[in-house]
Amino acid sequence: MTPQEFYQLLSQQGIELTDRQKDQFERYFELLVEWNEKINLTAITEKNEVYLKHFYDSIAPVLQGLIDNQDHKLLDIGAGAGFPSLPMKIIYPQLDVTIIDSLNKRINFLKLLAEELGLDKVHFYHGRAEDFAQDKAFRAQFDLVTARAVARMQVLSELTIPYLKVGGKLLALKASNAPEELEEAKNALNLLFSKVQDNLSYALPNGDPRFITVVEKKKETPNKYPRKAGMPNKRPL
């Protein structure tokens, strides 16, 4: 997908990018490739692939009508090089984006990226999702949590649901749809007072299948969740 094809596809779906937004995506690509030589950010570095598999893939929640250009507080867990939240932030500048990542080198990249792209209302924190979720400044503070290919729902729900306000939504972006994954996660979702609201399936322009599971938080999360760092993975709920 060339940048031109990227713009055209967005245009067909009612999103007209300004020259500034096009420049932001271009600069994002340049910095991603440049920094990838120093720290491992992505295996995808060819320009057309980045525009398809990182940029276009990341804005799926926008294209699927799950996010609009309001000042929603959005948390991105395990964003790596900023996916999916920062491409959405470029398109919808009103979003207030927070990223938590366990690798400080990636946080340094994201800080530089945000500065270079002139993004405001973006906040980056180095640490574990399990730890920040017990902090009052983060717990139950977000309207939306996004996670792209981070973990199975059984684990992911414990890492993300505590951050949501009641009525807030987790958007889990995945490349494969395993009905048994949601079946396995039933107990975890019940314990966390949350419910699968939707399971969307669509395809990238090259035909690759993609899925977004939407989970809504129904009641406050019990204080004991999430458990200590590492536990959700070792002993899923």
Swiss-Prot record:
<dbReference type="Pfam" id="PF02527">
    <property type="entry name" value="GidB"/>
</dbReference>
<keyword id="KW-0963">Cytoplasm</keyword>
<keyword id="KW-0808">Transferase</keyword>
<dbReference type="InterPro" id="IPR029063">
    <property type="entry name" value="SAM-dependent_MTases_sf"/>
</dbReference>
<feature type="binding site">
    <location>
        <begin position="129"/>
        <end position="130"/>
    </location>
    <ligand>
        <name>S-adenosyl-L-methionine</name>
    </ligand>
</feature>
<comment type="similarity">
    <text>Belongs to the methyltransferase superfamily. RNA methyltransferase RsmG family.</text>
</comment>
<dbReference type="GO" id="GO:0005829">
    <property type="term" value="C:cytosol"/>
</dbReference>
<feature type="region of interest" description="Disordered">
    <location>
        <begin position="218"/>
        <end position="237"/>
    </location>
</feature>
<feature type="binding site">
    <location>
        <position position="78"/>
    </location>
    <ligand>
        <name>S-adenosyl-L-methionine</name>
    </ligand>
</feature>
<dbReference type="InterPro" id="IPR003682">
    <property type="entry name" value="rRNA_ssu_MeTfrase_G"/>
</dbReference>
<keyword id="KW-0489">Methyltransferase</keyword>
<keyword id="KW-0698">rRNA processing</keyword>
<feature type="binding site">
    <location>
        <position position="148"/>
    </location>
    <ligand>
        <name>S-adenosyl-L-methionine</name>
    </ligand>
</feature>
<dbReference type="GO" id="GO:0070043">
    <property type="term" value="F:rRNA (guanine-N7-)-methyltransferase activity"/>
</dbReference>
<keyword id="KW-0949">S-adenosyl-L-methionine</keyword>
<comment type="function">
    <text>Specifically methylates the N7 position of a guanine in 16S rRNA.</text>
</comment>
<feature type="binding site">
    <location>
        <position position="83"/>
    </location>
    <ligand>
        <name>S-adenosyl-L-methionine</name>
    </ligand>
</feature>
<protein>
    <recommendedName>
        <fullName>Ribosomal RNA small subunit methyltransferase G</fullName>
        <ecNumber>2.1.1.-</ecNumber>
    </recommendedName>
</protein>
